[in-house]
Amino acid sequence: MAARHQFENSNEIGVFAALTNAYCLAAVGGSENFYSVFEAELSNEIPVIKASLAGTRLVGRLSVGNKHGLLLPTSATDQEVMHIRNSLPDEVIVQRTEERLSALGNCVACNDHVALVHPDIDQETEEIIADVLGVEVFRQSVAGNVLVGSFCKFSNRGGMVHPQASVQEVDELSSLLQVPLVAGTINRGSDVIGAGLLVNDWIAFCGLDTTSTEIQVIESIYQLHGADSSGAVRDIRASLLDTLV
């Protein structure tokens, strides 16, 4: 299923939360409803953790993780790191990384097997991503955008990329990631997919402005109903082509 959600008055829920197959981080200090929606939907499956990073609520943009691990910026305090580490399953590795591109959630997109990273990310950071998250790493842009974490979002079952990605680029990325992909939007036409969408292998949360058509595409491409995603890919490509024409 895909559920609409908001952080205070913001539809960019991916800025204030992070979701994987093993845990969910939700920003502290917002309305209790923001946390309680995640808790109601997820707590029977995975831990939902109230957290801050570097004294901010931007937990989704400052971190990147999957079921194997979680990477945090060096600006995260010892207390914040300890709280997160103590709240996560023991098998999840938590590590800080000295990366100048400290908004890791903007610069990295990953699932449990592969990661796309900003082309200018440090070599040491690339190695840490591969080691801690247990993924194969590819330096990549999406539709000419180097902030791959902002402009694409993929799980182990499917993914969505910037609406201006060409059919050829979508096909090449799909082959690279080994999951079906579609070029699409979130929050009524927004191309900043990573900021407006949280998804794992069985559930998605999207901003309150997300349209019914966008939700239908999300549920299909991420196979949240066990649906075949090929129909959604064809439908959204057709609608995008109609828009461009």
Swiss-Prot record:
Functional description taken from the UniProt entry: Binds to the 60S ribosomal subunit and prevents its association with the 40S ribosomal subunit to form the 80S initiation complex in the cytoplasm. May also be involved in ribosome biogenesis.
NCBIfam families for the chain: eIF-6 (TIGR00323)
Principal location listed in the UniProt entry: cytoplasm
One Gene Ontology term from the biological process aspect of the record: ribosomal large subunit biogenesis
Cellular compartments annotated: Cytoplasm; Nucleus, Nucleolus
Name the UniProt record assigns to this protein: Eukaryotic translation initiation factor 6
CDD domains linked: IF6 (cd00527)
Annotated organism of origin: Ostreococcus lucimarinus (strain CCE9901)
Keywords: Cytoplasm, Initiation factor, Nucleus, Protein biosynthesis, Ribosome biogenesis
Subunit structure: Monomer. Associates with the 60S ribosomal subunit.
